[in-house]
């Protein structure tokens, strides 16, 4: 863990954006989890360290998934949307991340 903390510049690049969707809000209310879009090469340990550093909360666990991009047609050519890596961050009881307050 101390090796990861040394490289704060890398931790700033791990979290790309919070995922704001219906499923993400249900998970946040029910399980005290927050969903982030993360860098494709990010590890669970890096995500945990980045969330603890940026939001000053304690993280219980991290689950990650890679959502494959859809094949889409652009005129007569076939293309593909980018793959997205998401991290479901489970916070310890009593911890909360409020994005509205963070933005102000």
From Swiss-Prot:
Which Pfam families does this entry report, sorted A to Z? Ribosomal_L23
Q: Kindly list the GO molecular function terms attached to this UniProt entry.
A: rRNA binding; structural constituent of ribosome
Instruction: Give a Gene Ontology cellular component term annotated to this protein.
Output: ribosome
Sorted alphabetically, which InterPro entries does this protein's record hold? Nucleotide-bd_a/b_plait_sf, Ribosomal_uL23-like, Ribosomal_uL23/eL15/eS24_sf
Tell me which UniProt keywords the record has, alphabetically: Ribonucleoprotein, Ribosomal protein, RNA-binding, rRNA-binding
State the SUPFAM superfamilies in the record: Ribosomal proteins S24e, L23 and L15e (SSF54189)
* Any one Gene Ontology BP term: translation
**Subunit structure of this chain's protein:** Part of the 50S ribosomal subunit. Contacts protein L29, and trigger factor when it is bound to the ribosome.
Entries under NCBIfam families matching the protein: PRK05738.1-3 (NF004359), PRK05738.2-4 (NF004363)
Q: Which PANTHER family match?
A: 60S RIBOSOMAL PROTEIN L23A (PTHR11620)
What does this protein's UniProt record list under function?
Answer: One of the early assembly proteins it binds 23S rRNA. One of the proteins that surrounds the polypeptide exit tunnel on the outside of the ribosome. Forms the main docking site for trigger factor binding to the ribosome.
The similarity annotation says: Belongs to the universal ribosomal protein uL23 family.
Which protein are we looking at? Large ribosomal subunit protein uL23
Show the taxonomic lineage.
Bacteria, Pseudomonadati, Pseudomonadota, Betaproteobacteria, Burkholderiales
């Amino acid at each position: 863990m101390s090796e990861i903390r040394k490289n704060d510049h890398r931790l700033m690049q791990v979290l790309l954006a919070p995922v704001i969707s219906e499923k993400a809000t249900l998970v946040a209310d029910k399980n005290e989890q927050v969903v982030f879009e993360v860098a494709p090469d990010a590890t669970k340990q890096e995500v945990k360290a980045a969330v603890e550093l940026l939001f000053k909360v304690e993280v219980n666990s991290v689950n990650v998934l890679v959502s494959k991009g859809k094949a889409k047609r652009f005129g007569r050519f076939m293309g593909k949307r980018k793959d997205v890596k998401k991290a479901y961050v489970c916070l310890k009881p009593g911890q909360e991340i409020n994005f509205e307050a963070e933005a102000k």
